[in-house]
Amino acid sequence: MTAIKRRPRDAEATRTQILDAAESLFAAQGFGSTSLAQIAQKSHSHKSLILHHFSSKDGLWQVVKERRFSHFVEERKSLFSRGGVTLDEIRNSVRAYFELLKNDPLLVQLLTRAELEQDLSCSQYDEKRLAPFVERMREAQKTGLLRSDVPPAHLLLIVTNVITQWFEARAMFAGWSELEGENLDSSFLESVEKVFFEGAKK
């Protein structure tokens, strides 16, 4: 009897189910504490299917992280290709990253887990993925928009790490008397912009 081949649509649906299940477990438990058996059970699939689609648990982990950032990065790269750098563009990119984390708490959980496990492969810190953003900072320095006595990579990491840390820890500050009556997110973003752009401008 001839075996029935899995249709491409079925294969893609299975792949998505595995990714969704792995994402949920990695965010809740971390990479090291999550087994392929747990992912298979949650995704209603088999370990053999997971290995077929992703080769290994590490391969699956990479794809889980990658898909949370891919749209943001590609959108920014498309904007970068339209012309010369401006302060408004950099400011909009900062706001877009802030909104990305604000609207995606699961991504924040994944970033927190990656940091706890010292995962150097995390997409947020991938050098190739961040290269267009570093280059944009460098262009802003060359055109006199930003100060040139600070490495462009430092400028990028300063602003992204401050924003990332805010979303990882903001619940800890929600009860501070100094912050009562404020919209915590919008107020913090405004402060980040003031400190970064005033300090980084030439």
Region locations from a protein language model:
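N-terminal intrinsically disordered/low-complexity leader segments
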Residues: M1-A13
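C-terminal peripheral helix-coil segments that are non-catalytic and often amphipathic
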Residues: M1-A3, E99, N103, A131-T143, ...
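Amphipathic alpha-helical linker/stalk segments
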Residues: T2-K5, Q62-N92
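Helix-turn-helix
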Residues: A13-Q17, A21, L25-G59, V63
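Conserved hydrophobic residue
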Residues: F31-G32, L120, L146
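Hydrophobic alpha-helical connector segments
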Residues: K77-L107, P152-V159
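All-alpha amphipathic helical-bundle segments outside canonical DNA-binding/catalytic cores
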Residues: D88, S123-K128, K142-I158
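A contiguous binding-surface segment within folded domains or other stable secondary-structure elements
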Residues: L106-R138
